[in-house]
């Protein structure tokens, strides 16, 4: 029996794939659990429209991420943290610090998008990766200075 998958099924296929399976597997497992639909013309067209909508949404998100990456490229943000003798920080720079510094410049990103190459635990200038989309990443520089007492 031919079915069109409504969800990814391990070992069988991904959303939108039309696969041929045994009748019992389709009728007793895939269809009742909402994993597949019979491969009628109407069901296939419906799934194809959903796939097209998802693809357009992904393209919009990628385009938006690329525009934001252009804004961020080459940017240097300053962060002041309490530091001891020799420039060692009390603690470290966190993704939340980066997000707050960017928010002050009018750029909104989430903490999960900030990727450190290594922990920042001292005063200086360090590169930090901002992952805006699975295909769009940009490096910014973080200038860590000791907080004035």
Curated annotation (Swiss-Prot):
Transmembrane segments: none annotated. One of its GO terms (molecular function) is rRNA binding. GO terms for cellular component: cytosolic large ribosomal subunit. The keyword Chloroplast does not apply. SUPFAM superfamilies: L9 N-domain-like, Ribosomal protein L9 C-domain. It comes from the Bacteria. One of its GO terms (biological process) is translation. NCBIfam families: L9. This is Large ribosomal subunit protein bL9. It comes from Aquifex aeolicus (strain VF5).
